[in-house]
From Swiss-Prot:
Ranges in a coiled coil: none
Catalytic activity, as annotated: a 2'-deoxyribonucleoside 5'-diphosphate + ATP = a 2'-deoxyribonucleoside 5'-triphosphate + ADP; a ribonucleoside 5'-diphosphate + ATP = a ribonucleoside 5'-triphosphate + ADP
Required co-factors: Mg(2+)
Zinc-finger found in the keyword field: no
Keywords: ATP-binding, Cytoplasm, Kinase, Magnesium, Metal-binding, Nucleotide metabolism, Nucleotide-binding, Phosphoprotein, Transferase
One GO MF term: ATP binding
Record-given protein name: Nucleoside diphosphate kinase
Entry similarity comment: Belongs to the NDK family.
Entry EC no(s): 2.7.4.6
Gene giving rise to this polypeptide: ndk
Amino acid sequence: MALERTFSIIKPDATRRNLTGKINAKFEEAGLRIVAQKRIHMTKAQAGVFYAVHAERPFYDELCEFMASAPVVVQVLEGEGAIAKNREVMGATNPADAAPGTIRAEFAESVGENSVHGSDAPETAAEEIAYFFSGMELVG
């Protein structure tokens, strides 16, 4: 398996409850290194651009409002098979379907407030990383 990078967001429901450290520990326990991280307050406009792929979906406006409702932590994670590993550690989108021990099983409040976002493919990871980080901010 190749060394790769993926993008992650610790969402407002998790930052409100001060879960950043616990979530980061899950990533690190899975062998993922945090090579860039910053806490930001995303604007609704930033969320709208970031989640543009969902613009036609009924939950889009609510998602953008939620993502702008409190600070988030944007991150770049690195490791062997980082994209798949991160998705495994996060668990299913619906916390009711998430495997025990995953981030969403332990911390998510609902399908909408599910604590974390993670890239689903190398192409989206590259786009999402570039949206929030410059190359100089990625320290491997």
